Amino acid sequence: KIYASGFNAADFSFSYFPCYDYFDGREIIQVFFDVDGNMLVYTIKEDKYYLTKIGSTLTSFETLQLDVVYERECTENTTLFNKNSVFEVNDPSSCLFFGNQNMVYKWTYNQSEIPSKAFITLPDGEIIKCMNQSADHKQLYIGTYNSSRSGLKGSLYIYDSDTGKVIGKPYEGVADEPVKVMYKVK
C-alpha cells in the first residue's frame, strides 16, 4: 500500500491515509514527486507496467476520491527502471535520471515510454550506487562501486545534466562502497 500524508477530503482531516486502496493488487516499483508536488507511482499489475500521476492535493474535492491526474501504460523498456534503481528527479527538465548497472538513463516522465538508449555510460565494471545533483540541477553526481578495482573501490563521476558530458576528471578509487553523494554549496 501507499500511504500519503495530507488533507483527506473524505473526512476533512490531515493524516496518513492509504490512497483509497487505489494501488491494491499492484506491485509498487518506485514512487517519486515532481516539481509541483505531484506523486508519480510506477507499478506492475497483471504483467503490465503503469505510471500513475496523483495530484498534489491527493484528493479531488469534487469526487472525494484519489486525484488521479493520469495513468499511462508503459510498454517500452519497462524493466530498466526497477526496485533496485538509484534515481534522482531533475525538476527543471521534468525528467528522472536512473541507474541500471553502469548506465544512466534520462526519462522525461510525462511520456510513458522509458528510453532504450543510455544517456550516460560509465566505464565497464562500475556499478551505480547513489546519485545527487547540484543545487541548480545542472550537474549530476554519480557514486559508483567497482569490485575489481584494487584498494578503495568507490568512485565519483560528475556529468552535465543537460548534455550528459563528463565534467572534469573522475575521482576513481576515493572511497569504500558509496551510499550517498551530497552536494554542499561553497
Positions of predicted regions on the chain:
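Solenoidal tandem-repeat scaffolds enriched in leucines and small polar residues
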Residues: 1-26, 31-35, 40-41
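Short coil/turn segments that connect the beta-strands within blades of beta-propeller domains
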Residues: 36-38, 92-94, 136-138
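A short beta-strand motif characteristic of beta-propeller blades
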Residues: 12-23, 60-78, 114-123, 165-171
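Short loop/turn segments that connect beta-strands within beta-propeller blades
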Residues: 7-12, 55-58, 108-113, 160-164
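Structural motif
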Residues: 1-6, 46-55, 101-108, 149-158
